[in-house]
Amino acid sequence: MPACYCATSTSLENNELLYKNIRNLFSTSRSFPIEQEWMNLKSISQMKDFFSNFPGNSKANNHFLCNSPLKFEIFNNEKSVKPSNGPHLFTRCSCRCNKLLSGDYITQQQPIDASAEHSLNAKGINTYSLKNCFQRSGFIGSYEESLFSGHMPYCSSVPFEFSIEIGVISFCRCKPSLVFPPHLKINFVAYSLVGNVDNVQFPYIGRFRLRSQKSDKVMNKGYPFGYRIPSVGQLQLILRQTNGLVIKVFLVPYNVSSMVDCSKTWIRQKHYLQQLDDKSGKILSHLKFGLQLQIICTSAGHHYLYDSQRIIFVQQSLGGLYGNTKIVNETLLSESCR
């Protein structure tokens, strides 16, 4: 589970032992700070300047944080500290601290271990979505835009497994194989958000990548860029739980015949639940389902669903609604194809 740690309150325990183990790994490094400078560090927040002056900290790594509860276990455990990987560990530590210690809070998400990743791959689950579908950061534009981009100032829950089935039907003249091509089924994982916000139910955020489904026979033989679609038609995406229960069926009509060769675009569909507030008389809209699909037009004029697709959904039925409530569907196409 993700956790938050305050950078100004985390203290450095066993400072002397920590310095000794790290210093032994950098016996050939002349730029390593002297012991007196290290001992003056009283908290994690003071390590920002210390790491910023250390060479080789241009890139950040999401899988290691020096201020996590495992920091002393990593550096104090002689079995885990080896001369071969010590400089690499310390560089990752310094890079991440230099980037994140400027803020008030730091987030540490547990990386997927090898056994868990192997288990997910054996089930056919796209581990790309598990590692990249969510990033904790500030809002980007509106709340909806932040959901679609995956940047939210809240922690994520444990991953949940889902599956999605993609199909398309053609509304234009095309090859017979594109009139109703075989469906493509993809397993993926989705997160829910965890935040201290009253009366707010966060939806699930999932991401699946078409190009990485190399084990699928359809992808190997017929769709090198992703899932090929006709220029005009209607996409059907069926979202299911692992037990086969259907959560939502997305029907996305589209027309990308105006796309030029070697261009990209996206389609976004949003489903709102609108309610009339009895007190204020205003109409309140709540995003319940969302879908963002990326489309590419190759140099040969073929259209594909490609790369990563994002989906937003809730696991509650919208049926049985009554009173001043209605469901509104909205489909958007990027300006390049309008």
From Swiss-Prot:
GO terms for cellular component: cytoplasm; cytosol; nucleus. It comes from the Eukaryota. Transmembrane segments: none annotated. SMART domains: DUF4210. Pfam families: Chromosome_seg, DUF4210. This is Uncharacterized protein C3H8.04.
